[in-house]
Amino acid sequence: RVVFHAGAPSTLAESHDAFGLTRVAIDAGNVEDALTASGSIPIVSDPVEDIAGAAPGDFWDGGLIDYHLLLPHSRLDGIVLYPHFVPHVTPGWLDKFLPWRARPRAHPWLANVLLVAPSRAFLDRLPSRKLPDRNDFYRYGLDHAARIRDWERAIAECERFADAAMAWLARPDPSRVRTL
C-alpha cells in the first residue's frame, strides 16, 4: 500500500491492518501518475510503472483492500468530510455482497466523520432508482443511446443536487444532518 499525500504525512493510516504502508509526498513530478494509478483497475487496466518518489514497481488503484477505506479518523482533530455514493461504510471489497457485511454499522473510528451521500429520495428520481455504474453497460447492452440518455438525466439530477448542496452550505440546516 502506497499513500500519496500533500502536506505533512498523517498518522491516520498507521498499522491498523496486515498490509504495510509507504507514504510518498505528492508533487508536480508525480501527481499525474499517482492520480492515473488511483483509477487503474487491477487486472483490467495496465499499471502505472515507477512513479517518481516511490519505490520502483507497478501501481494500481487500491480498491481491492481499501475500498470503503476504514481508517482511524477519530485520531484526527476536527471533522473529516467523506463524500460517498452510499450512506454507510463497509470496509473491504471482495466480500461486500455478503449480507452480514452489507449492514451499516457504527464504528468508533468514524465518530468525527461527516459522510455525505445521496438520500433515498434523491436516488428515486434517477433512472433505475440508482446512480449510474459499470453494470449499466451490461444492463443496456448495445443500446448506447438509452444508456447515454439515462446517464445524462442522472447528471442533470446530480447538478441539481450540487446546487442544493451549495445552497445548504450558504445557509446550513443542522436538522438535515443524520448520524451514521
Each model region followed by its residue ranges:
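Patatin-like phospholipase
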Residues: R1-L180
